Swiss-Prot record:
Protein's pathway: Cofactor biosynthesis; thiamine diphosphate biosynthesis
GO molecular function, one term: CCA tRNA nucleotidyltransferase activity
Annotated catalysed reactions: [ThiI sulfur-carrier protein]-S-sulfanyl-L-cysteine + a uridine in tRNA + 2 reduced [2Fe-2S]-[ferredoxin] + ATP + H(+) = [ThiI sulfur-carrier protein]-L-cysteine + a 4-thiouridine in tRNA + 2 oxidized [2Fe-2S]-[ferredoxin] + AMP + diphosphate; [ThiS sulfur-carrier protein]-C-terminal Gly-Gly-AMP + S-sulfanyl-L-cysteinyl-[cysteine desulfurase] + AH2 = [ThiS sulfur-carrier protein]-C-terminal-Gly-aminoethanethioate + L-cysteinyl-[cysteine desulfurase] + A + AMP + 2 H(+)
Protein name: Probable tRNA sulfurtransferase
One of the GO biological process terms: tRNA 4-thiouridine biosynthesis
Positions of the THUMP domain: 60-166
GO cellular component, one term: cytosol
Residue ranges of the TM segments: none
Binding-site positions, ATP: M184, L185, H209, F210, R266, G288, Q297
Stated role: Catalyzes the ATP-dependent transfer of a sulfur to tRNA to produce 4-thiouridine in position 8 of tRNAs, which functions as a near-UV photosensor. Also catalyzes the transfer of sulfur to the sulfur carrier protein ThiS, forming ThiS-thiocarboxylate. This is a step in the synthesis of thiazole, in the thiamine biosynthesis pathway. The sulfur is donated as persulfide by IscS.
Organism: Limosilactobacillus fermentum (strain NBRC 3956 / LMG 18251)
InterPro entries, sorted: Rossmann-like_a/b/a_fold (IPR014729), ThiI_AANH (IPR020536), ThiI_fer (IPR054173), ThiI_N (IPR049961), THUMP_dom (IPR004114), THUMP_ThiI (IPR049962), tRNA_STrfase (IPR003720), tRNA_sulfurtransferase_ThiI (IPR050102)
Record family assignment: Belongs to the ThiI family.
């Protein structure tokens, strides 16, 4: 069926009071960004909902993109007809012909924004329902409480719109309404899921990835970039900041006792992420830590690591177990990429028995053996920033290079 418009309903935006307009404006901007390749599509954000005018564009690919825009509770493809009852009946019958396959219950719900239209909502419900029963005498029956099909009719100034579908959106808040944060992105399963959940709460993210050549490979770096491409479909594009970490890891290994390697290393990672946040107008640092999952994610470890900053360190998957995280990773299509066996810097130089309850004073004293300021400055001087868009691929490019070398 050739639809004329998609009616988008807001989620939590309806609770935002005086701030609602700024949330709606941001959602409108995000929808325009998501649909930028469809030149004929027009976006009209209003107080109660957002209207996507298709102007001949196929609704299916547009709806697939809308499913990935946070801040949308649900949406409905709709037909527009002229403001006369016969046209409404004709469109309603066409909609039902596609959906009625045997005995089916239905009801009609009408909203009238144009109060000059001669037919009231109750009369429209009654007359249109009767016309549909006449058109499908053996299959249709009315059920106003739990119908199989709800036909929604909106009488507006520019026409009458009909829809019977309600498609679930991504929920959450529009990306950009909750401020900006730095996401510490490894190549594992947890941090992409944490990034997804942060985006869903309206946070605009930049990815911070630590890489340690030659201990980590080009494939590991490419994997992290491609994971960012998977996440970019929810926010339009994401800046990927790669931070050279080899010198820091080698120095920590040389000067810090084995049991505290991981703690001091992660203190330096957090220092760098916070420095980037301060430099790039970020308000918080996000990571993929899940309480108790590994040695560095005990509360004692978190205390010893987070000691280096006063900036909020937020952990969206803190209370999730591994199976819950994996389920989300599968749903957002990052799982298969995350489990590719390319070692990242978080697993380089991992001691066999890291401290699960590191002592804060000892962590500070071991870190004091390092030229922290110099190490950080050299790492920050060596960063590279890439803007990554939805669907960008990096692993295949690297595989082609390796194939040529072979």
């Amino acid at each position: 069926m050739k639809y004329d418009e998609i009616m988008v309903r807001y989620g939590e935006l309806s609770t935002k009071g005086h701030n609602k307009k700024s949330f709606i404006d941001r959602l409108g901007s995000n929808v325009r960004k998501a649909l930028h390749q469809y030149d004929q599509v027009k976006i009209h954000p209003n107080q109660d909902r957002l209207h996507v005018e298709l102007n001949g564009t196929d609704a299916e690919p547009v709806m697939e993109r809308l499913k990935q825009v946070f801040g949308i509770q649900n949406f409905s493809p709709s037909l527009r007809v002229e403001k006369d009852f016969d046209s409404v009946v004709e469109a309603a019958v066409a909609i039902f012909k596609e959906q009625v396959q045997g005995p089916t219950t239905f009801k009609v719900e009408t909203k009238r924004a144009d109060h000059k239209f001669p037919m009231g909502t109750f009369e429209m419900n009654k007359q249109l329902g009767g016309a549909l029963l006449k058109a499908f005498p053996t299959d249709l029956s009315v059920d106003v409480h739990h119908p199989d099909i709800t036909l929604r009719v909106e009488i507006r100034l520019n026409g009458i719109y009909l829809t019977s579908a309600k498609i679930l959106g991504a929920g959450g808040l529009p990306v950009g309404t909750a401020g900006k944060g730095m996401m510490m992105l490894s190549g594992g399963i947890d941090s992409p899921v944490a990034a997804y959940l942060a985006l869903k709460r309206g946070v605009s993210l930049e990815m911070v990835h630590f890489y340690s050549p030659p201990y980590t490979s080009e494939q590991a770096l490419a994997k992290a970039k491609e994971l960012t491409g998977k996440l970019a479909k929810y926010s339009g594009s994401i800046k990927f900041i790669q931070v050279p970490f080899t010198e820091i890891q080698e120095t920590v290994k040389e000067k810090v006792p084995e049991g505290y390697l991981m703690t001091v290393q992660r203190r330096l990672m957090l220092r760098l992420a916070c420095a980037l946040a301060q430099k790039r107008a970020g308000l918080a640092v996000f990571n993929g830590e899940s309480l108790g999952q590994v040695a560095s994610q005990t509360m004692e470890s978190m205390l010893a690591i987070e000691d280096v900053t006063t900036m909020p360190v937020l952990r969206p998957v803190l209370s999730y177990d591994k199976n819950e995280i994996i389920k989300i990773a599968e749903d957002i299509d990052t799982y298969d990429l995350s489990i590719l066996p390319y070692e990242d810097c978080c697993t380089v130089f991992t001691p066999p028995s890291p401290k699960t309850k590191p002592n804060l004073k000892r962590a500070r004293s071991y870190e004091a053996r390092l030229d922290v300021e110099g190490l950080m400055q050299r790492a920050l001087d060596g960063i590279e920033i890439t803007e990554i868009h939805a669907g960008d691929e990096f692993l295949n490019q690297n595989q082609d290079v390796f194939a040529e070398l072979l």
